[in-house]
Each structure stands twice: as C-alpha cells, then as structure tokens.
C-alpha cells in the first residue's frame, strides 16, 4: 500500500467512497474496492435499507443535535454562542447526508452518488475546520459574536468544504489529472488536514483550561471525547471486518464509529457549556419559573408596603387623577 491509497482502508471498512476509488474491475469495468465484510441489508415496507444499525444511530444523532442546538440558543450571553452553534449546524448537515448515503437512499453506482459522497467529504472537512476556528474563540483574540468572528468561521469552513468537495469529485470523475487510482490529494484533505485541525483544537483547549481556568473538570470532557473518538476510528479502520464476521453481518465498524463520533461531538458541547458563563440578567433558562415566589408575605409585612390597606389595594399608588384640557372634558 502506497501513501494515499485506500486499498487497505476499504478492505477493512465499508466506507461510501470505497465504491468510487480503486482500479477498474477486469470483468465489469467498474471501479471500486469491495470490503471483506459489510453489514447486511434489511427490508422494511418493501424498501431495502443499507447499514440499518448505523442509519438508526444517525437518526438518534439528529435528535441529540437538535437538543444541543436548543440549549445553545437559550444561552444568549454565553461566549462563542454563535460560533459553536455553526459547528453543530454543520454536524447536522453531515449527519443528514451520511444518513442518505448509508441508508441507500442514493444507491451506489447511481449517477448522483459521487456528488453526494463528495458533499459528505466536504462537510467533514468543514466540520473539522469549524472546530479549529472555535478553538480560537476562548482566547479572545477578537470579540466573539461580531461579524468578524462569525464570518471568519463561515468563510474558512466554506473554503474547506469547497476544496474537499472539488478534490473528491475530480478524483471520482477522473478530471483534472486525478483519478480513482490517484487518491493522494483526497487522502491528504480528508485525513491529514482534518487530523491537524482536531489536534490543534485539542492543544488550544488544553492551554485555555490550564492557563485561564481554576477548575480542571473540563479536562475530563476533553479526555473522554478524545478517547471515544480514537476508539471509533480504531474500530472502523482496524476491526470493522472482524466485528462484522463475528456478529453474522448484522453490524460492522461503521455502527460503532457513528456512536463514538456522536459521543465526541456531545463532549465538545459539554466542554463549551461548562467553561462558558452568561449574564443571568439577560439569559433565558431552560427550567421554567426560575424566580418563582415560594411563599406569600406575612400580613404585617404586606401592610407595611407602599400600598395601604384601604378599600382599594391600589389607593396608595403613585397614580393620581388629573384633569385633561382636551376638548374641555375631564379624564
């Protein structure tokens, strides 16, 4: 296996792009690398669903992402609120795209399939880039929530999406000097650059916690998120075929990787939620009746208030009847 080849990777893991890379078959003439083992299809309501277990996890991930977005939106004055919510919007788009591809809504060998896989690759790069830029927010190099901060995140994420999408599509379509057998460019963008983005984000958050925070609990969130992410990658690229064979093709490494990726993203949210503070005067809490009065004032205390105990409980208020000269009528 040479640098940038997907032969070994695709033999172990049933990735969507594997059917679009590799040498052409001498029999059918179609490109693609067949994995050693992949999860069996299931039939539901006369519809064949690919990767049923992984598709179910994608649906759970969408629900969890909506919940996290709602919690973030409720913290109006938290640092980096607009920036981190962009990260979760990109993750939601990536999950939706992965669900469409993995479930077979767009089947392999169909015309739109290369474009959907290219979009998936682009969203993956955009997600990692968004995570990297979010790592700068805590250092207050520029004010968060401003046009500079938000558009810097959007433009860099969009740029990486475009680069990854174009390189992937050129590779799949054998355009621009790239081909399914010349995958070095796509490998560098998808694996090398994304790994660098994640590594830089982790280092920056460690520096942020160690240098600016007295509480060390956020380090646990970082450690757990990194652990489950690494476990997911190992299960996918090293043991996917072994898992698949031992469970009679009901599951493969993609199922466990999807779960681990979801947990890692949840730890990103948990870390941000833990280290951010907000002004209680302007915040909107999730729990209702935060300032609910638990008991009434005693009778003697109530009589001592600005409202006197007369026939009208508003008699002692500051409002007084006054005459109006409008059309010589009194109001």
UniProtKB/Swiss-Prot annotation:
GO terms for molecular function: unfolded protein binding. Belongs to the CHS7 family. Keywords: Cell wall biogenesis/degradation, Endoplasmic reticulum, Membrane, Protein transport, Transmembrane, Transmembrane helix, Transport. It comes from Aspergillus oryzae (strain ATCC 42149 / RIB 40) (Yellow koji mold). Pfam families: Chs7 (PF12271). It comes from the Eukaryota. This is Chitin synthase export chaperone. Interacts with chs3. Its main location: endoplasmic reticulum. Chaperone required for the export of the chitin synthase chs3 from the endoplasmic reticulum. It is a multi-pass membrane protein.
């Amino acid at each position: 296996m040479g640098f940038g080849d997907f032969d070994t990777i695709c033999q172990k893991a049933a990735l969507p792009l594997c059917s679009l890379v590799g040498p052409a078959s001498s029999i059918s003439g179609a490109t693609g690398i067949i994995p050693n083992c992949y999860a069996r299809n299931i039939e539901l309501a006369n519809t064949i669903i690919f990767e049923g277990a992984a598709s179910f996890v994608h649906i759970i991930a969408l629900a969890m992402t909506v919940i996290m977005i709602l919690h973030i939106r409720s913290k109006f004055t938290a640092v980096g609120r607009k920036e981190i919510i962009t990260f979760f919007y990109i993750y939601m788009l990536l999950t939706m795209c992965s669900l469409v591809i993995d479930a077979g809504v767009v089947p392999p060998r169909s015309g739109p399939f290369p474009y959907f896989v290219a979009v998936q690759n682009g969203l993956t790069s955009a997600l990692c880039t968004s995570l990297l830029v979010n790592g700068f927010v805590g250092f207050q190099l520029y004010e968060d929530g401003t046009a500079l901060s938000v558009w810097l995140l959007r433009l860099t994420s969009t740029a990486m999406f475009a680069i990854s999408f174009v390189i992937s599509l050129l590779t799949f379509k054998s355009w621009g000097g790239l081909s399914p057998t010349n995958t070095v460019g796509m490998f560098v963008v998808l694996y090398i650059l994304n790994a660098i983005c994640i590594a830089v984000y982790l280092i920056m958050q460690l520096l942020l916690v160690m240098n600016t925070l007295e509480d060390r609990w956020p380090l646990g969130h970082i450690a757990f998120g990194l652990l489950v992410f690494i476990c997911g990658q190992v299960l996918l690229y090293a043991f996917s075929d072994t898992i698949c064979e031992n469970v009679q093709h009901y599951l493969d490494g993609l199922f466990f990787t999807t779960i681990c990726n979801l947990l890692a993203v949840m730890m990103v949210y948990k870390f941000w939620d833990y280290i951010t503070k907000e002004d209680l005067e302007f915040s909107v809490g999730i729990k209702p009746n935060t300032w609910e009065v638990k008991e009434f004032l005693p009778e003697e205390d109530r009589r001592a208030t600005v409202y006197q105990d007369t026939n009208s409980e508003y008699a002692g208020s500051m409002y007084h009847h006054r005459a109006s000269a409008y059309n010589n009528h009194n109001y």
